[in-house]
Regions:
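Short acidic linear motifs
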Residues: 2-9, 25-26, 59, 132
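Internal low-complexity, small-residue/proline-rich segments
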Residues: 40-198
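N-terminal leader/signal peptides at the extreme start of proteins
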Residues: 1-17, 80-81
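N-terminal single-pass transmembrane signal-anchor helix
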Residues: 12-46, 56
Length: 199
């Protein structure tokens, strides 16, 4: 009968360095495989949120149309000196401001003093500074403020919140003829849903 030495009978406790490195490597590989899946899930959630924003805006436009029998104008403005309609005049609020009540943004809409004061009026500072998430796609990481400048001098006039969703002015270049468009949202437009035949 052979005798086992005391050293042979001791239990081996702990990990070797190689075993520890193998476990760390396996965990690292698993994380590397799971990270893209997590990022894809986040991107899918952002896309879903973006689609939901478009759905809310579309519904608000439909509710506006049901109320006023027309889609909101691209923008309304007049020459402050003459009071006559002028695409480059004031107040200059566009379609996105006009549908605010239909996006459950009544307090903000009421702050605009019924769109009578110009965008640049100090009383509209609070409204101008408000960035609405419904007008932004979550995948956009850019600055959500746009600087309105005087065209002749390039001097900044004010900052305005941006939107990832634009109304279609038409096929004309807005710079060439700001008062005329063949889309849905142009100066003083009164387009009904029934007027839209091609999309």
């Amino acid at each position: 009968m052979s005798r086992m030495s005391w050293r042979d009978r001791t239990l081996r406790l702990g990990f070797t360095l190689i075993e520890l490195l193998a476990v760390i490597t396996i965990i690292g590989i698993m994380i590397a495989l799971l990270l893209p899946a997590v990022q894809q899930t986040r991107e899918a959630a952002r896309r879903t949120s973006c689609k939901n924003n478009l759905k809310q805006i579309g519904l608000a436009l439909q509710l506006y149309h049901d109320t006023w029998q027309t889609l909101p104008p691209g923008w309304l403005a007049r020459d402050p000196a003459t009071g006559r309609a002028d695409p480059e005049g004031e107040p200059g609020w566009g379609w996105a401001a006009r549908i605010l009540p239909f996006l459950e943004q009544d307090p903000l809409f009421n702050q605009l003093v019924h769109l009578e004061l110009p965008i640049t009026d100090p009383q509209n500072d609070w409204a101008r500074a408000t960035v609405l998430s419904v007008y932004l796609c979550p995948t956009d990481s850019h600055n959500h403020q746009w600087v309105l400048e005087d065209e002749s001098t390039g001097v900044p006039i004010t900052e305005l919140p941006t939107s990832n969703y634009a109304g279609v002015f038409g096929t004309f270049d807005i710079e060439d003829n700001p008062g005329r468009g063949d889309g849905v949202f142009f100066f003083q437009s009164r387009v009904r849903v029934a007027d839209i035949h091609d999309g």
